[in-house]
Curated annotation (Swiss-Prot):
Biological process, per Gene Ontology: translation
UniProt-recorded name of the protein: Small ribosomal subunit protein uS2cy
Subcellular location per the Swiss-Prot or TrEMBL entry: Plastid, Chloroplast
Taxonomic lineage: Eukaryota, Viridiplantae, Chlorophyta, core chlorophytes, Chlorophyceae
Region (Disordered): 83-106
Family that this chain belongs to: Belongs to the universal ribosomal protein uS2 family.
GO cellular component terms given for this protein: chloroplast; mitochondrial small ribosomal subunit
Membrane spanning residue stretches: none
Gene of this entry: rps2-2
CDD domains associated with the record: RPS2
Segment forming the signal sequence: none
Listed GO MF terms: structural constituent of ribosome
SUPFAM superfamilies in the record: Ribosomal protein S2
Length: 379
């Protein structure tokens, strides 16, 4: 808008200049405002008569004009062949005073007239081609920017459409995945139930093979019960565990109370001291070597120490001055005769053993969860 206004001002100035130059009796002279004042003072103002005045534009537009001219002078040195001090004084005065065009009438009406124009306005006319070119470039840029905006709008609409389609696809895939995962979980549970039923059916078939043979055996009910229990342990459920008191009562049913009580006491005592050996018989050497033995009183328990060394079990022992530390893997130097020291050591060890067992359970649960996740993603 500024360039358009300046271009219109320059065109109006050109028209006035051309109109004045067409008249043969008039001549145009460009002067600065200071020279015009000195000329009036020197002649006394008698011969110089002001017939017409050409007012300057508004102060705001005039300041903008001055700023454009000063910028152009910085960019193109030598474009204006005027003195810097003269132009600055002219600009300062021109903002406050109008540009005066005068006609000098010394003789009659047919004598030639001179018209004085401000030097700044005369030089501002030279900027018309620059304004024209700049307006053309600005219009070209606007056209290019409009094209770019149209292209950007088209690409933006395409992106939004593709984004909507992708969102719909994502929702569909999530819904399908949820349906598939639910079906998979149901089928997995059904498969586990089917496996359990198959195992039970196989174990029942194994048991039924031996039942016809038991029919013809001349045995009592107690013996039959024991044989069926043995078959149940070996073929149906090997992990089945029975309380020992129930077994004692079944075997001592038909004996007197006195004999039953004495035998039961003997069996309980034997179970107390040698019950762990039965479980050790079912374990491998690797499983035994993973266990740990805590021994207090090495001299009294040398047999246990030798057995642990044969089986490869690690030994934690409270070692006193009368003990041999060579037979021990992990030494705990303390008094093995005092009750308080033994109680403190065993209490601390128990707390950390239980903590380790809890941590092992948590780690095993996490490992199972990760395996289940891997299996799901594999399918």
């Amino acid at each position: 808008m500024k360039l358009v206004q300046f271009f219109e001002i320059g065109q109006q100035l050109l028209k006035t200049k051309d109109f004045v130059e067409k008249n043969k009796n008039t001549t145009v002279v460009t002067l600065s405002y200071e020279k015009l004042l000195t000329l009036q003072n020197s002649t006394g103002g008698d011969n110089l008569q002001v017939t017409a005045t050409l007012p300057n534009p508004s102060p705001e537009i005039f300041k903008k004009m001055i700023a454009i001219v000063s910028n152009l002078r910085k960019e193109e040195n030598g474009f204006f062949a005027t003195n810097q001090m003269g132009t600055s004084s002219n600009r300062a005065k021109s903002t406050d005073t109008p540009a005066v065009s005068t006609s000098q009438n010394v003789g009659g009406a047919n004598e030639p007239k001179t018209i004085l124009i401000s030097k700044f306005l005369n030089k501002f006319i030279l900027l018309l081609p620059f304004f024209k070119n700049s307006l053309q470039t600005l219009s070209d840029r606007l056209v290019q920017q409009e094209k770019m905006l149209k292209e950007l709008n088209s690409t933006f609409t395409k992106i939004t459409e593709s984004q909507k389609s992708l969102k719909q696809l994502y929702k569909k895939t999530i819904s399908q995945y949820a349906v598939v995962s639910s079906k998979f979980i149901v089928q997995q549970n059904n498969f586990k139930k089917f496996q359990k039923n198959l195992k039970q059916f196989a174990s029942e078939q194994r048991l039924l093979k031996f039942l016809p043979k038991l029919r013809y055996l001349p045995t009592s009910q107690t013996k039959m019960y024991e044989i069926v229990e043995l078959f149940m342990k070996k073929f149906v459920d090997p992990k089945l565990s029975y309380p020992m008191e129930q077994i004692y009562d079944q075997k001592l049913k038909f004996t007197s109370k006195k004999i039953a009580a004495t035998r039961k006491q003997k069996w309980q005592r034997l179970e107390k001291y040698f019950g762990g050996i039965t479980k050790m018989a079912k374990m491998n050497t690797k499983q035994i070597s993973k266990n740990v033995a805590i021994i207090i009183g090495q001299q009294e328990e040398m047999n246990a120490v030798h057995e642990c060394r044969k089986l490869g079990m690690k030994i934690f022992a409270v070692v006193d001055t009368n003990c041999n530390p060579k037979f021990v893997d992990h030494i705990i130097p303390a008094n093995d005769d005092s009750r308080n020291s033994i109680k403190y050591i065993l209490g601390e060890m128990l707390t950390y053993i239980r903590l380790g067992q809890k941590l092992r359970k948590k780690v095993s649960l996490r490992a199972k969860i990760q395996q289940n996740r891997k299996k799901r993603f594999a399918y």
